[in-house]
């Protein structure tokens, strides 16, 4: 489980002054709906003293579209990251119910071609993977193309795979790590070799998968009367803080993806940096972290097994 971040109240006054400033700036902007990413960064406004109630009220009173604009600018400028734990929790409790889901949707729209690293642990065939897999991933959303390398400090080190739906939507090309890495072969994306390592296919490696999963589950949460997360907290993930939202379902699986799910929002970018899920016995069955997420423009060699950088 992710460690709880330590909260300091030392910067509370300055933090809420910044919060009030950003709220005032956002309220003054005229932005077309759905184009928050295109809006100019608002100029700062001086704000006196500790304006905790005022700042939160200003942000929470904005319509959803303006809250998304505000959140986008606060993340990009680093203001969101500079708020302390208590301020972050209070802020996200005050936002409109639809703001979080609409905000992370902007991340899926923006991050369509990117490189990242991921740490993953899963319960596969009833057994928990005690050592995380640490992978470098190069990902293109459309057409779906994925290159993955298992890094030296994680499980299955040295393994590589490439998936290109243009060549074959049902198979991937891979080689194992270690002394067996001389042999490369085609395998079904949901075949036995893949399922021995993961409950997910290569098509489910991107941050968009976890966003889409959250959006689908959110509809089911609300249909079941679960209107808001049971807990909002600030946790640490690989040296970075996340705002973590825990959702608990009345019946669990198979009606829902998990009995309990916790998603950690990145403070700089509009996506979930972490995802954890528990089964009906409240045993953790998967844990994912995404780090070093960087927008890229890939050429065709990135998804070609003949790339001299690779060892196929």
Predicted regions span which residues?
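N-terminal short leaders/motifs
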Residues: 86-106, 185-193, 215-233, 243-244
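N-terminal secretory signal peptides that target proteins for export/translocation
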Residues: 1-15
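Bacterial N-terminal signal peptides
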Residues: 19-30
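Gly/Pro-enriched, hydrophobic low-complexity segments
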Residues: 41-49, 54-58, 151-153, 162, ...
């Amino acid at each position: 489980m992710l460690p709880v971040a330590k909260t300091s109240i030392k910067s509370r006054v300055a933090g809420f002054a910044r919060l009030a400033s950003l709220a005032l700036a956002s309220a003054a902007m005229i932005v077309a709906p759905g184009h928050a990413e295109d809006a100019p960064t608002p100029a700062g406004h001086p704000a006196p003293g500790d304006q905790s109630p005022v700042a939160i009220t200003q942000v929470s009173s904005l319509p959803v579209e303006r809250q998304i604009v505000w959140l986008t600018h606060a993340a990009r400028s680093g203001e969101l990251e500079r708020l302390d734990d208590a301020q972050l929790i209070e802020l996200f409790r005050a936002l409109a119910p639809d703001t979080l889901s609409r905000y992370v949707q902007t991340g899926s729209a923006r991050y369509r071609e990117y490189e990242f690293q991921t740490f993953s642990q899963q319960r596969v065939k009833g057994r928990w993977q005690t050592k995380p897999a640490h992978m470098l991933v190069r990902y293109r959303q459309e057409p779906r193309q994925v290159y993955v390398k298992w890094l030296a400090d994680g499980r299955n080190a040295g393994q590589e795979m490439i998936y290109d739906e243009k060549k074959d939507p049902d198979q991937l090309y891979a080689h194992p790590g270690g002394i067996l890495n001389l042999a490369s072969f085609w395998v079904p994306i949901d075949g036995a070799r893949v399922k021995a390592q993961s409950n997910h296919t290569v098509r489910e490696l991107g941050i968009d998968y976890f966003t889409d999963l959250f959006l689908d589950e959110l509809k089911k949460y609300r249909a079941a009367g679960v209107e808001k997360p049971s807990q909002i907290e600030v946790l640490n993930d690989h040296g970075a803080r996340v705002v973590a939202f825990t959702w608990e379902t009345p019946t669990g699986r198979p009606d829902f993806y998990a009995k309990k799910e916790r998603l950690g929002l990145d403070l700089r970018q509009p996506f979930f940096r972490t995802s954890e899920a528990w089964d009906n016995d409240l045993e953790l069955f998967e844990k994912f972290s995404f780090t070093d997420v960087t927008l890229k423009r890939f050429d065709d060699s990135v998804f070609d097994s003949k790339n001299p950088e690779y060892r196929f």
